[in-house]
Amino acid sequence: MIPPADSLLKYDTPVLVSRNTEKRSPKARLLKVSPQQPGPSGSAPQPPKTKLPSTPCVPDPTKQAEEILNAILPPREWVEDTQLWIQQVSSTPSTRMDVVHLQEQLDLKLQQRQARETGICPVRRELYSQCFDELIREVTINCAERGLLLLRVRDEIRMTIAAYQTLYESSVAFGMRKALQAEQGKSDMERKIAELETEKRDLERQVNEQKAKCEATEKRESERRQVEEKKHNEEIQFLKRTNQQLKAQLEGIIAPKK
């Protein structure tokens, strides 16, 4: 007989219920884990409301305690070689040494399973949930009312953790979307920067070409202006000489007549 995974919650000795489970429903073949085991790290369902069994008019205290324990912490079942085994939560009262041993086992399992001391840690949460369920079991045996009150506290804590986990997952998803959008925006911006740099280089090339053309044009115009000025000066000098000659000839013609 291979029992289920070890737990800090104290159970009685497993009892063989049936030797043939071929005709049982598939659900009975699966290991039924009591609600003190936390769910996977990916989901934290809301714990179900615990329904307490009805008690007779003159209840047996031991019987009533067992029924309350089974309602709070349901027995776990598993199938091995077509044999159905069931294991109920122990109804044996605990002693001070049991509490000390529970603390030692908790510390040992935290160390063995390398649970993180801070931050979110599914392993640490699972072990502390088992420890809390064991404390609920011990208190319920001595006082059912206190046990039921602790059960309400446990369920409230689980609902709060489930709400925080849902909020955390949605925040992570929102952060991932924003990161992807930022990455996409970064890629678009880098592509736009590359296009602008290419356009800048093309404009700089055009500016250099226009500068070269402008310098060549200025040089041509300067040379042409110098040639025209030289030609203009030569024409002026020619006209001055012609004017002097004509003036001398005119004076020569007019002078003898006097």
UniProtKB/Swiss-Prot annotation:
Pfam families: Ax_dynein_light. GO terms for molecular function: dynein heavy chain binding. Residues 34-44 have a biased composition (Low complexity). GO terms for cellular component: 9+2 motile cilium; axoneme; ciliary base; cilium; cytoplasm; dynein axonemal particle; dynein complex; filopodium. Expressed in many tissues. A smaller 0.9 kb and a larger 2.5 kb transcripts were detected at the highest level in the testis, at medium levels in the prostate, heart, liver, lung and pancreas, at low levels in the ovary, skeletal muscle and small intestine. Not detected in spleen, colon epithelium, thymus or peripheral blood leukocytes. The 0.9 kb transcript is expressed at a 20-fold higher level than the 2.5 kb transcript in the testis. Expressed in spermatozoa and airway epithelial cells (at protein level). InterPro entries: Axonemal_dynein_light_chain. The keyword Magnesium does not apply. Residues 1-60, 207-231 are annotated as: Disordered. It is found in: Cell projection, Cilium; Cell projection, Cilium, Flagellum; Dynein axonemal particle; Cytoplasm. Keywords: Cell projection, Cilium, Coiled coil, Cytoplasm, Dynein, Flagellum, Motor protein. Residues 176-255 form a coiled coil. One of its GO terms (biological process) is sperm flagellum assembly. Interacts with CFAP45. Interacts with DYNC1H1. Belongs to the inner dynein arm light chain family. It is linked to Spermatogenic failure 83: An autosomal recessive male infertility disorder characterized by asthenoteratozoospermia. Patient sperm exhibit an asymmetric fibrous sheath of the flagella. Involved in sperm flagellum assembly. This is Axonemal dynein light intermediate polypeptide 1. The gene is DNALI1.
